[in-house]
């Protein structure tokens, strides 16, 4: 059994991946204005890309990140342009269609790689501090998550982020001033899909890789976005980190089977106490 300090460090790294997932989902909800239930499938896609690279002797997390992001972006743009944009005014159709895509992906993954969980070698430690092992994938995951959160926060507070903010607030005005709203929507969908795949590729060495592995991260990212709000990106980041820590510590102290139940209980309690989410409680921040 690993020491508690190791569990806490791994929880931070897990939370960083959850933060990436939640950031991508927040982009889709804010700009495209749909609930994308296929978001978890892109997370799974990233994990399988990392697995395929590892089985071919490429053990670089950076290579996995770039390849997973590129493939997921292409699929995301295709899905956003060919399906999401045409039916986005019908939320039920979007939900059913995106869920159908996720199920289709799970079935294809099962045909290609089987239903049994796969694993990736954790590799040599990046560093060891007082017996606590720091893995490359975890460090990169944390750095990427911090960089993306910082970039998104900066973008939304600068003129360069005006198109996204304007589309999120009023699409008619955005179209009236000459913005290609439809193009921005499907490119945003592609970018968010790429972020989800990066999260999956970075977390792949620490989890069992299976066709349905994206379901729990999808649920947790939805919870994070609902609780934190779509515009409070740093609130979103820290809440995701907290969920990662809570997940790992509860699995360590209790049992893995209780971990996600405890997470759902805590967040449901949070939403009961603050129905409008954490963002409404901190109007002056980020």
Residue ranges and their predicted role:
Residues 14, 133-209, 233-238:
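Helix-loop-helix "hairpin" substructures at the membrane interface of multi-pass membrane proteins
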Residues 1-20, 49, 58-65, 90-95, ...:
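Membrane-interfacial amphipathic/re-entrant helices at transmembrane-helix boundaries
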Residues 89, 112, 151, 169-183, ...:
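Cytosolic-side transmembrane-helix boundaries in multi-pass membrane proteins
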Residues 9, 31-78:
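Membrane-embedded helix boundary and interhelical linker motif in transport proteins
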Residues 82, 86-157, 184-187, 282-286:
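Transmembrane helix-bundle core of multi-pass membrane transporters
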Residues 25, 58-101, 108, 239-243, ...:
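Alpha-helical transmembrane segments within multi-pass membrane transporters and channels
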Residues 16, 25-47, 89-94, 163, ...:
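Short, non-helical or kinked segments that cap or interrupt transmembrane helices
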Residues 2-17, 155-161, 188-231, 251-261:
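Inter-helical junctions in multi-pass inner-membrane proteins, predominant
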């Amino acid at each position: 059994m690993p020491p508690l300090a190791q569990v806490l460090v791994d929880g931070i790294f897990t939370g960083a991946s959850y933060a990436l997932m939640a950031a991508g989902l927040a982009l889709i909800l804010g700009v495209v204005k749909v609930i994308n239930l296929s978001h978890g499938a892109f997370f799974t896609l990233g994990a399988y890309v990392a697995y395929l690279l590892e089985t071919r002797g490429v053990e670089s997390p950076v290579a996995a990140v770039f390849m997973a992001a590129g493939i997921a972006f292409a699929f995301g743009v295709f899905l956003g342009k060919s399906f999401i944009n045409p039916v986005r005014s019908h939320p039920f159709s979007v939900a059913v269609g995106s869920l159908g895509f996720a199920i289709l992906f799970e079935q294809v993954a099962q045909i290609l790689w089987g239903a049994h969980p796969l694993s990736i070698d954790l590799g040599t430690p990046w560093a060891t501090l007082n017996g606590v092992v720091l893995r490359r994938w975890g460090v990169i995951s944390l750095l990427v998550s911090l960089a993306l959160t910082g970039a998104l926060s900066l973008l939304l507070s600068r003129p360069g982020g005006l198109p996204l903010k304007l589309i999120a607030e009023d699409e008619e005005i955005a179209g009236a001033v000459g913005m290609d709203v439809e193009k921005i929507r499907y490119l945003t969908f592609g970018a968010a899909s790429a972020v989800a795949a990066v999260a999956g590729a970075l977390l792949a060495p620490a989890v069992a890789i299976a066709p349905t592995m994206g379901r729990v991260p999808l649920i947790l990212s939805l919870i994070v976005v609902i609780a934190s709000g779509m515009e409070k990106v740093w609130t979103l980041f820290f809440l995701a980190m907290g969920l990662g820590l809570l997940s790992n510590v509860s699995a360590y102290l209790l049992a893995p089977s209780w971990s996600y139940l405890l997470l759902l209980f805590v967040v449901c309690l949070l939403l009961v106490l603050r129905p409008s989410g954490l963002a409404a409680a901190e109007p002056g921040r980020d």
